[in-house]
């Protein structure tokens, strides 16, 4: 964003589902047919840097990454290109992850798109496939643990709803209602909103994706609310 402020980081959902790592510049390489068994499952992280950590906070070390992900082989991002050069010559097919959300926009090239194009230039004779199609099918079946996490997101959202049900009265602003919701999310250890909350009073309730939330709520008006907590990588939607 403007100046030296940063947009809040949100991890790729497939990567988080596979590794549990919630840190930027992370990659996962899976090569089950690698002749070197050590490099069949590789987690790629940014090398910890004392100066960068002073500004941006702690970065995972090898032991921490292993504990979170269950992956033994950890390599640093600045060395992955040289390793890929060796591994890829022993493979015929390359699967790359892409954001296949049906509502995704195409206004600008994403980092992942540029990386895919770079791979095709570096290794033009390989066969390329979509890993997102596979992960989408796998992620559709939730484990008991995932169900517990989703239920926690639901429970936090319910607490927020009950809070605002007691708070709402004529004369409050839509953004005050949103503030109560976010407060309840954060105090219950949610990472925040799953998406921008809609608090639409009066005529604004007819706007499907109204997100300004800056008008006063008047006596007798309907208030349309659409919000949900994000917890453990899962969003609720009320």
Language model: regions and residue ranges:
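A composition/biophysics-driven feature that prefers long, compositionally simple stretches
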Residues: 1-159
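Short catalytic-site patches enriched in acidic/histidine residues
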Residues: 3-9, 117, 129-137, 141, ...
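Short amphipathic alpha-helical leader/targeting segments
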Residues: 34, 164, 234-235
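Short, charged/polar low-complexity linear motifs in solvent-exposed/disordered segments
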Residues: 35, 59-62, 167, 175, ...
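Generic hydrophobic alpha-helical segments
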Residues: 80-84, 164, 181
């Amino acid at each position: 964003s403007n100046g030296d402020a940063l947009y809040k980081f949100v991890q790729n959902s497939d990567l988080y589902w596979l590794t549990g790592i919630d840190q930027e510049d992370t990659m996962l390489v899976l090569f089950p047919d690698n002749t070197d068994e050590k490099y069949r499952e590789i987690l790629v992280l940014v090398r910890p840097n004392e100066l960068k950590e002073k500004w941006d906070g702690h970065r995972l070390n090898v032991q921490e990454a292993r504990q979170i992900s269950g992956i033994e082989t950890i390599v640093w991002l600045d060395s992955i290109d040289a390793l890929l050069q060796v591994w890829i010559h022993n493979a015929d097919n390359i699967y790359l992850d892409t954001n296949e959300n049906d509502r995704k926009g195409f206004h600008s090239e994403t980092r992942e798109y540029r990386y895919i194009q770079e791979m095709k230039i570096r290794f033009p004779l390989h066969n390329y496939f979509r890993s997102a199609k596979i992960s989408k099918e796998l992620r559709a079946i939730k484990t008991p643990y995932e169900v517990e996490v989703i239920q926690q997101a639901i429970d936090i959202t319910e607490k927020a709803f009950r809070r605002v049900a007691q708070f709402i009265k004529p004369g409050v602003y839509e953004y005050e209602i949103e503030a109560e919701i976010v407060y309840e999310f954060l105090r219950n250890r949610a990472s925040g909103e799953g998406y921008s909350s809609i608090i639409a009073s009066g005529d604004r309730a007819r706007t499907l994706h109204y997100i300004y939330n800056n008008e006063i709520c008047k006596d007798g008006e309907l208030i349309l609310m659409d919000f949900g907590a994000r917890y453990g990588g899962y969003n609720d939607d009320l």
